[in-house]
Amino acid sequence: MKDRRLVHRLSRADPDALRQIYHRYKDDLLTVAMALLADPDAAEDCVHDVFVHFAGAPADMRADRNLKGYLMRCVANRAKNLIKRQQLQPVHQIDEPDYAGEQDCPEGRLIVSEESMRIFEAMAKLPCEQREVVSLHIHGQMKFREIAEQLEVSINTVQSRYRYGIEKLRTFL
């Protein structure tokens, strides 16, 4: 079912519509929240807070907007607010990633876990604007144009934040 139809059904208090939206986008949203917060519990709380707000006010979303992009932006904003309000420091403790095959042996689990840890630590060192753009582009699979629209900045700004963020990640890793 198309997103617009689901949002319309949600505005008519259809709980199944919210359930479908949640299951369609929760993994992508959790990935972005985790990349921004580096704390699995805080990331999950962030996504749930966004869905609670969205369920209470689906009319806030303009009909012409991309639902996934809108929810990604809500998660990014919520994560930034958590960081500002609580001065949330990344915990650097992550759940074991689920990479099939690589975790079949203890060495594979250790390598995957160490790589994930290094990436999350490096992401946490980026300035918030760069971390947001890198997360939305890589983890959220959003195009630069979509990110620019959601952040309400120029596409050149998004591209430069991404470029500088990636350059810094390379130096950190």
Predicted regions and their residues:
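Structural recognition of an alpha-helix C-terminal capping motif at a helix-to-coil junction
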Residues: T31, D45-V52, R65-N77
